[in-house]
C-alpha cells in the first residue's frame, strides 16, 4: 500500500496558455478513487465499525462474510442465486441460497494492481433466453494473477462476452472480445522533447470500469481516464506547451486505441458503435481509428468512477465520479455530455475553490505531474472556454457534489415497494473510506430522492444543500460526511463498489473491504 502513497517531485509551472486545468496533481493521493486500490494482493480485514442502517423500519443482514476475497459485484441468475466476481483472484463464483459453490464458474488471469482486476459484469437483457454475460476485467501479461503494476498489456482492459452453461453447477465460456482499452500507464518514461514527464510513477489507477445495460438494451461502459491528458480530458493539444503535441509515449492526444479513456461508451452486444450515438456522424467525418472510437462515445470529460445506474422511471443514466481531492460528483448523464474534467470538477461556479484546494492543501502530486493544478483556469468563464467541444457536446453541472472527496461508489435505483413505498424511485449510493481514516463513518450509504420530473436530485428537505454541494470538512483525511447527514441511510459498510436490487426487491450491497455482501430489507 505504501507504494500507492509515494510522494512525487514537485512540478515547476511553466507558462499556461490554452491548456487548462485540473490537473494531475494529487491525482490520487492515497488512492482515493474508492479506496479501491485496496491492497490488491492481500485480504482486507472486516471493518470494526458496526454495519448499521439508519431507518428503524429497515434491517441489514450479513449474507456472506466468509469465503470471498475482494468481491466487486454481483448479478442475479434467479431468486437466491447469483454470481459474484473477485477483484484479485480473477474468479467468478456462484452463490446459491447463501452458499458459495465449490467450483468457480470462471477463473481469469488478472492484474489487480491498484484499481485493476476483475471489475464488473452484466447479464444480457434477454438472459437466460440469450445466455450471454459480459465481463470487464484487466488481464495479466504473465498468464497468471499478478499485482505487479507493470505486468499488464498496453491495452489490457477488456470487455468480453461469455456464454453461460448451466450444466454441472454452471460455467462461463469465452465467446468474443468486444473491446480492449488502455491499461499500462508509462508516464515514468520521458516523452521525447518533454523530459519533465519522467518523474511520474507507474500507475494502475483511474481504471474504473462499470458495465450496465440500458433500457435500450445496449451496453454502457464507464472507463476511467487512465491518467491520460488529451482530447477526452479537454486538452486538445495534450498536456505539453510545445511540440510535439502528444499525450504520452504512445501518441495522442486524439483518442486512438491507446487514448480512449475518461468516457462512457455505448455499444451493441458485439462491441460496435450505435448509429444514434451522439458523435457518430462526427466520427465518420474524422475517419480512421480515431473516428471509429469517437463514434462509440456517449459522454466524455470524466475522471474515474465505479457507479452507474439507470432510472427505471425515466430511463436516464446516473453515474458517480471520484474526485482527486476536491468535488466528488453524482451526475445525470445526457447523450453528448462533457463532464468538464480536467478543466474543473464539481459545479463550474466553484472553480476558484477547486483550484485553491488542489494547489494549496495537497502538495504531493502523485501522478500526471506534467499537468499540475497551477494550470487550472482562474475563472469559470475561462475554464469553460477551454473545454474540448465535439459537435453537439454539452457541459452540464453535477446533480450533486461534495467539497472534499468521499469516494462515491456503487449505485442502484429502488423499484417497487419491498423496502416501503417511501423508497420507491430513490437512488442509493455507496462510498469509500480512506486508508488513513480512524473512526468516522466507515463507508456510508446515501439515499437520494429525485424531483417529480426525475431530472434532478431533490434536496428541498435540507436548506444547507440548496446549492447541491455538501460542504464537508477535511479532518486529517478526506471521506467526511458533514452536510450529508440527511442523505445518509447507512454506515459501516466499507468500500462498496456495487449495489444491486435482487428479485425479491431487497438491496444487496457488495463491500470489497469487508469481503462481505449485505442485504437490506424491510423489517417484518
Show the residue positions of the predicted features.
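Bacterial N-terminal signal peptides that target proteins for export
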Residues: 11-31
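Sec/Tat signal peptide C-region and signal peptidase I cleavage site
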Residues: 42-46
Amino acid at each position: 500500500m505504501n507504494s500507492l502513497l509515494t510522494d512525487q517531485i514537485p512540478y515547476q509551472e511553466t507558462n499556461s496558455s490554452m491548456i487548462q486545468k485540473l490537473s494531475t496533481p494529487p491525482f490520487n493521493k492515497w488512492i482515493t478513487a474508492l479506496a479501491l486500490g485496496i491492497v490488491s494482493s492481500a485480504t482486507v480485514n472486516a471493518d470494526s465499525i458496526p454495519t448499521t442502517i439508519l431507518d428503524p423500519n429497515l434491517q441489514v443482514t450479513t449474507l456472506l462474510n466468509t469465503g470471498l476475497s475482494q468481491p466487486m459485484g454481483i448479478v442475479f441468475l434467479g431468486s437466491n442465486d447469483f454470481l459474484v466476481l473477485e477483484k484479485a483472484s480473477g474468479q467468478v463464483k456462484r452463490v446459491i441460497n447463501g452458499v458459495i459453490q465449490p467450483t468457480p464458474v470462471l477463473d481469469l488471469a488478472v492484474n489487480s494492481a491498484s484499481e485493476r482486476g476483475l471489475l464488473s459484469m452484466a447479464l444480457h437483457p434477454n438472459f437466460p433466453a440469450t445466455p450471454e454475460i459480459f465481463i470487464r476485467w484487466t488481464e495479466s501479461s504473465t498468464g497468471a494473477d499478478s499485482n505487479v503494476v507493470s505486468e499488464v498489456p498496453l491495452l489490457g482492459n477488456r470487455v468480453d462476452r461469455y456464454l453461460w452453461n448451466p450444466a454441472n453447477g454452471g460455467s462461463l465460456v469465452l465467446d468474443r472480445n468486444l473491446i480492449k482499452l488502455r491499461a499500462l500507464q508509462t508516464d515514468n518514461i520521458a516523452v521525447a522533447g518533454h523530459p519533465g514527464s519522467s518523474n511520474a510513477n507507474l500507475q494502475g489507477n483511474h481504471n474504473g470500469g462499470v458495465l450496465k445495460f440500458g433500457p435500450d438494451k445496449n451496453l454502457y461502459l464507464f472507463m476511467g481516464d487512465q491518467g491520460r491528458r488529451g482530447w477526452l480530458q479537454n486538452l486538445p493539444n495534450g498536456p505539453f506547451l510545445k511540440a510535439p503535441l502528444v499525450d504520452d509515449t504512445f501518441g495522442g492526444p486524439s483518442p486512438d486505441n491507446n487514448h480512449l479513456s475518461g468516457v462512457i461508451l455505448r455499444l451493441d452486444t458485439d462491441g460496435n458503435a450505435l448509429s444514434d450515438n451522439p458523435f457518430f456522424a462526427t466520427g465518420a467525418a474524422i475517419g480512421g481509428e480515431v473516428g471509429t472510437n469517437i463514434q462509440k462515445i456517449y459522454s466524455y470529460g470524466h475522471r474515474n468512477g465505479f457507479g452507474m445506474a439507470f432510472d427505471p422511471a425515466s430511463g436516464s443514466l446516473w453515474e458517480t465520479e471520484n474526485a482527486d481531492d476536491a468535488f466528488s460528483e453524482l451526475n445525470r448523464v445526457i447523450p453528448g455530455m462533457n463532464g468538464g474534467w480536467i478543466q474543473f470538477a464539481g459545479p463550474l461556479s466553484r472553480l476558484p475553490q477547486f483550484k485553491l484546494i488542489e494547489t494549496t492543501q495537497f502538495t504531493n502530486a502523485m501522478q500526471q505531474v506534467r499537468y499540475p493544478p497551477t494550470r487550472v483556469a482562474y475563472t469559470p468563464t475561462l475554464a469553460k472556454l477551454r473545454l474540448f467541444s465535439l459537435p453537439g457536446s454539452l457541459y452540464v453541472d453535477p446533480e450533486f457534489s461534495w467539497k472534499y472527496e468521499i469516494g462515491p461508489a456503487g449505485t442502484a435505483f429502488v423499484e417497487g415497494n419491498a423496502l416501503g413505498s417511501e423508497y420507491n424511485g430513490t437512488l442509493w449510493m455507496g462510498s469509500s473510506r480512506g486508508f488513513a481514516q480512524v473512526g468516522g463513518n466507515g463507508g456510508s450509504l446515501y439515499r437520494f430522492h429525485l424531483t417529480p420530473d426525475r431530472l434532478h436530485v431533490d434536496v428541498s428537505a435540507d436548506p444547507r444543500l440548496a446549492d447541491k454541494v455538501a460542504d464537508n470538512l477535511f479532518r486529517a483525511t478526506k471521506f467526511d460526511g458533514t452536510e450529508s447527514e440527511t442523505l445518509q441511510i447507512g454506515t459501516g459498510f466499507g468500500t462498496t463498489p456495487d449495489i444491486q436490487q435482487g428479485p425479491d426487491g431487497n438491496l444487496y450491497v457488495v463491500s470489497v473491504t469487508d469481503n462481505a455482501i449485505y442485504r437490506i430489507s424491510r423489517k417484518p
